[in-house]
Amino acid sequence: MRLSALKHLIEATQALCHPERIRVLGSSALLASFPELGEPGQPLEISFDADLLIEPCDPQLAAMLHEAVGEGSLFAQRTGYHADFLRPDILETLAAGWELAVVSFAGIANASALAPADVAAVKLRLGRPKDLQLCRHLIVGGLVAPEAIRARLDAMTLVESDIVRVFARLREVSN
């Protein structure tokens, strides 16, 4: 996904519901800091969705937005990309203080993206192969320092088994 596509999704969502705020979470949030990641040959080139948290949002609004710009919508069929709308409880899985480091989008009011170190921390927690590959790209490419990710992991609420697993993943992608 390119930054222009992400901005289009945000603007379409804003036009539909006029939210107080839109938060971009997930991999596409990286485009706010590193637009080049969506270019050909880059890790987000083949990403076709953006995880959006609309504030405020109720189940009826989420259903309406999904029909309008979600997976399988006419919008998605026409553009080739779509939005996935998240529940507010997703914020409980993020590191404490995440909202202090969000990245704004130039030219789009009331929209921000999760900071790169926070995205990487979430991806390491998930641990899917594609997530680990993305984290490795961020670290090896010098886009995010392992120490910054470690700090965000330290600020997450993790059970002991997750702590061991997540920090092992960080060591793995840092080498």
Locations of regions flagged by a protein language model:
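Compositionally biased terminal segments of proteins
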Residues: 1-175
